[in-house]
Amino acid sequence: MSKDLLYELIEALTILPGVGKKSAQRMALFLLDKNKDGALHLAQTLEECLDSIQRCEICRQLTSEPVCRICSDESRDAYSLCVVESPSDVLAIESTGGFKGRYFVLMGRLSPIDGVSPDDLGIPDLLRHIQGAKIEEVILATSSTVEGDATASFINDHLESVKVSRISYGIPIGGELEYVDGNTIARAIQGRIII
């Protein structure tokens, strides 16, 4: 018996966040029936990304180069480091133009229940980077959740001789950065508090 490729495509699309069966079905039918060129471009771009995208050797951001464009940019403030949970948080902050320093991407947040430890988040690498790069200020831009707060607190407890602040203004309790508008994020960065 042959595979039902349409069904497989619909199932494959449901792995995307927020995409259920109905949305996946609409997307699949649109790509196959109305926009084959777009579908081919999507498939080629996705394949290229899967082959080429890696983590930056310095900040762990997703990039196609060993060192990302932000870490390579000498015009950025090399002494100010913003610690975020995910690459989407970097994109959200960058879209505001409100931060000119560099980043460290944890790729998650501490969660003992889920078995996510400081080592899983690269926190030992972060602490070595802060020391080695002579960082003067660390901005903790983790989500306003129990896990995000615990992650920020853990990092803060392990930092000495460096100014540490946490974004706060305008980020709702329980909120995640990727869902907050740019102006709110910019104000949160500007209104950060020392902890």
What are these regions (language model features)?
Residues 24, 73-142:
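Extended interfacial segments that mediate partner engagement and assembly in macromolecular machines
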Residues 7-11, 25-29, 40, 44, ...:
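Solvent-exposed alpha-helical segments within well-ordered globular domains of core cellular machineries
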Residues 2-7, 11, 15, 27-90:
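Cys/His-rich Zn2+-binding cysteine-cluster or related metal-binding knuckle/ribbon modules and their
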Residues 8, 35, 127-195:
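Long C-terminal interaction/binding lobes of large macromolecular proteins
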Residues 1-2, 144:
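A short, flexible low-complexity segment enriched in Lys/Arg and Gly/Pro that occurs
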Residues 38, 43-46, 57, 69-70, ...:
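Core recognition of P-loop NTPase motor domains used across DNA-transaction enzymes
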Residues 17, 36, 49, 61, ...:
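Conserved phosphate/pyrophosphate-binding and hydrolysis machinery centered on Walker-type P-loop NTPases
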